[in-house]
């Protein structure tokens, strides 16, 4: 940090009212010469008044400000320093700009250093997000409650931990020991009274949020470990496993509604829109597969991509589907035309693991490099950095108000990011040029600050002062 001193700081401490009565160009006749101090020391008088620095300062009575006496003053000060053993070294200045310590003349109304002001302002800002959560085990998935300030967290030990959060603290409300192996996915239903979880033990558990009791379970829901899950309606949800099998479930039925196997690799993401007609899934073998829910059969399957398709998001009032990949690429599909993409955007080089839509055009993505980025996806642009982890971002979710994002990585922590500032964000036009600086630009939610943003206020203050 550079040391920025206010121009008024020196004047407020160096003004001597006695010097204003004569012209600095002429030497005052009544100034005491240095040799007089040597012959007639006034130490006794100084000792009597020494206790009150504010009423009396020897330098104010005998100090010299004329440039003609600088050499004599230096000699006098060095002699005094030898006689007094260097105790008055602080008062041996050759000019009248620093007669006292800064703290002696400090005034709260005086203009402070602008850098210090900026730091104090940041410290005094009220918290706009909950504190980080440090967990004992790896976090595999998390999900916000649809109405309450609750966050469900799945861990590698098979537990589902429910946290209640505020801007001041995060407390554990309940711990559900539901699975014998690592949790893969956890979701609240639309009403928020049920908590559904899947795990590597191939089971699906439905837990009552209020009582913590098990409401329903499927022990051997899949032949392979369940990889992902998505709520469809109040009573239905879909699951996909490591072997490429998709199943649609109804909480009121014992057996799955239907089962399909259209891919050979793991199903990474499942999504639908408000109409609930098409169910889309991405897989590790590079396919986007669309299922017609009413007909319970495959609608269309895309051309294969030479990369894993990892995440999806619906934008532009359900008219666009954007798919992220393990190579950091984004493919845009017109809704209903899922055979091949209509647009492509090359994003960061790191693979994309998660995508959370926050507006009709903007999403927050989490990647292998541990960075959460804001992406304007229709058209494709990087807007900046929302937050960061030290390891790859594995899971993310957005709360019901759309103001808070929670994310986690393999460093055993959950971090929150306030993204309310996107409410006033302008849309990007198609003919606008991409900004390369946006790749490393920190947005207000980031834990890191842009140096240009920090000092921009200082530059503005200096230019304003020069204009005055």
Swiss-Prot record:
Please indicate if the UniProt record lists Nucleotide-binding as a keyword: no
Region Disordered, residue ranges: 1-107
Q: Does the keyword rRNA-binding apply?
A: no
Q: Where is the composition biased (Acidic residues)?
A: 15-26, 41-58, 67-91
Keywords of the record: Repeat, WD repeat
Sorted alphabetically, which InterPro entries does this protein's record hold? WD40/YVTN_repeat-like_dom_sf, WD40_repeat_CS, WD40_repeat_dom_sf, WD40_rpt, WDR55_POC1
User: WD repeats span which residues?
Assistant: 134-173, 178-217, 221-259, 262-301, 304-343, 388-427
Q: Which PROSITE patterns match?
A: WD_REPEATS_1, WD_REPEATS_2, WD_REPEATS_REGION
User: Coiled-coil segments, which residues?
Assistant: none
- Give the family per the record: Belongs to the WD repeat WDR55 family.
Q: Per its record, how is this protein called by name?
A: WD repeat-containing protein 55 homolog
Say which species the protein is native to: Aedes aegypti
């Amino acid at each position: 940090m550079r040391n920025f001193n206010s121009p008024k700081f020196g004047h407020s401490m160096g003004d001597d009212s006695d010097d204003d009565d004569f012209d600095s160009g002429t030497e005052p006749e009544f100034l005491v010469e240095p040799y007089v101090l040597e012959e007639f020391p006034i130490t006794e008088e100084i000792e009597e008044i020494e206790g009150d620095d504010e009423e009396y300062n020897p330098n104010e009575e005998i100090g010299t400000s004329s440039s003609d006496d600088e050499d004599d003053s230096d000699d006098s000060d060095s002699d005094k320093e030898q006689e007094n053993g260097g105790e008055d070294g602080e008062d041996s200045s050759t000019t009248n700009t620093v007669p006292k310590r800064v703290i002696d003349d400090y005034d709260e109304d005086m203009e402070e250093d602008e850098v210090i002001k900026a730091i104090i302002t940041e410290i005094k800002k009220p918290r706009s997000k909950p504190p980080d959560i440090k967990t004992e085990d790896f976090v595999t998935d998390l999900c916000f409650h649809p109405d309450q300030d609750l966050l469900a967290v799945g861990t590698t030990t098979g537990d589902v931990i429910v946290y209640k959060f505020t801007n001041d603290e995060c407390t554990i409300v309940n711990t559900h020991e539901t699975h014998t192996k690592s949790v893969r996915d956890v979701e609240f239903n639309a009403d928020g009274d049920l908590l559904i979880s899947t795990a590597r033990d191939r089971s699906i558990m439905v837990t009552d949020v209020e009582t913590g009791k098990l409401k329903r379970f499927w022990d051997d829901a899949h032949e392979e470990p369940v990889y992902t899950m998505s709520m469809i309606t109040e009573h239905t949800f879909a699951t996909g496993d490591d072997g490429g099998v998709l199943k649609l479930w109804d909480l009121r039925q014992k057996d799955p509604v239907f089962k399909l196997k259209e891919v050979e690799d793991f199903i990474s993401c499942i999504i639908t829109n408000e109409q609930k007609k098409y169910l889309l899934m991405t897989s590790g073998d590079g396919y986007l597969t669309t299922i017609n829910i009413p007909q319970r059969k495959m609608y269309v399957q895309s051309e294969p991509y030479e990369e894993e398709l990892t995440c999806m998001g619906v934008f532009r009032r359900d008219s666009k589907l954007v798919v992220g990949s393990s190579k950091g690429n984004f493919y845009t599909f017109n809704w209903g035309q899922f055979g091949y993409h209509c647009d492509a955007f090359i994003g960061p080089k790191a693979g994309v693991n998660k995508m959370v839509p926050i507006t009709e055009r903007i999403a927050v993505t989490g990647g292998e490099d541990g960075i959460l980025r804001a992406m304007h996806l229709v058209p494709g642009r990087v807007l900046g950095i929302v937050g960061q982890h030290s390891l790859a971002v594995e899971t993310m979710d957005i709360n019901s108000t759309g103001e808070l994002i929670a994310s986690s990585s393999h460093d055993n922590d959950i971090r929150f990011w306030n993204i309310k500032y996107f409410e006033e964000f302008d849309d990007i036009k198609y003919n606008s040029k991409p900004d390369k600086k946006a790749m490393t630009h920190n947005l207000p939610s980031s834990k890191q600050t842009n140096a240009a943003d920090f000092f921009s206020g200082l530059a503005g203050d200096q230019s304003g002062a020069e204009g005055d």
